[in-house]
Amino acid sequence: YAGVNFLKNIASMNDWIVVHDAVRPCVSQIALERLWDIGSKEPDGAILAIPVSDTLKLGLADKEQNDPTSVYIKKTENREYYWLAQTPQMFKVELLLDVFQGKTFSFTDEASAVESIGKKPRLIQGERKNIKITTPDDLKIAENWQLKEEGVTAGHNMRIGQGFDVHKFGNEGKFVILGGVKI
């Protein structure tokens, strides 16, 4: 809120604020341009997001066990309308000021705060490589994406070369056996 509040003194109420998590360093220029091109026409703002592709299960904790990993499937959700929110997320200064004005928050992102006042931010197709790095495994995945972008195969020190080989035919006959076939 402090950043948005600061901007009210130097920005127009119609200016856009683009909020981005530092833990998502793999956002591409293409995704940013898509967000801006589509999102800047949306009065309720917009966010990058990707559709859920895995089967989505609603878990139910086993209350008899005192173990947070003891979770069972309550039901399988229809993933058709579920998306995974990403950043950047973009909103007009005025909208975010209205949302944050004098409230205490328990929101996980700006979009959910905007939703809380009845607005409907637009979902803009993001990219899977725009991963949120919160675990060591996430960091490895992000590094692999970066290596792929640079044209390097992760974990391999590969070199490609070209050569040739010349041999004299023996006196036994004028043929060669290649792949088990007499030529």
Regions found by a protein language model. Give the residues of each.
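Short phosphate-binding loop-to-helix
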Residues: 1-14
